[in-house]
């Protein structure tokens, strides 16, 4: 079997197409969540703690020299990315829970015992006496 034929069979199964769609949607979702955190969530938090823009929070480790910028420890961007991770984790957990609820089949009612099972139960009950 040729490599091309094997790949075609693998791709046609649907898993590759589903995965590609998931990656594309995930990339777009990541941009939306990033914008939500940086443009909607962080500004009010910064305002509440004194008008701070988290993107600008940094500590200068080494001053600027000729031809080189200052070395900065940008902890504000890190805090913002931690919030971003939290929002993505909550959204992914919510979507996973929703998908599992949709996929989970309704529990079937217990099946009625067969005639053989009923007979065996009666025999067991008689032997107990």
UniProtKB/Swiss-Prot annotation:
A GO-annotated cellular component: plasma membrane
The organism's place on the tree of life at top rank: Bacteria
Membrane topology: Multi-pass membrane protein
SUPFAM superfamilies recorded: Gated mechanosensitive channel (SSF81330)
Keyword tags: Cell inner membrane, Cell membrane, Ion channel, Ion transport, Membrane, Transmembrane, Transmembrane helix, Transport
Gene3D superfamilies assigned to the protein according to its UniProt record, in alphabetical order: Large-conductance mechanosensitive channel, MscL, domain 1
Alphabetical list of InterPro entries matching this protein: Mechanosensitive_channel_CS (IPR019823), MS_channel (IPR001185), MSC/AndL (IPR037673), MscL_channel (IPR036019)
Molecular function via GO: mechanosensitive monoatomic ion channel activity
TM helices/strands, residue ranges: 10-30, 70-90
Main location group: membrane
Localization of this protein: Cell inner membrane
Pfam families per record: MscL
Entry-linked NCBIfam families: mscL (TIGR00220), PRK00567.1-4 (NF001843)
Subunit note: Homopentamer.
Role noted for this protein: Channel that opens in response to stretch forces in the membrane lipid bilayer. May participate in the regulation of osmotic pressure changes within the cell.
Family from the record: Belongs to the MscL family.
Name recorded for this polypeptide: Large-conductance mechanosensitive channel
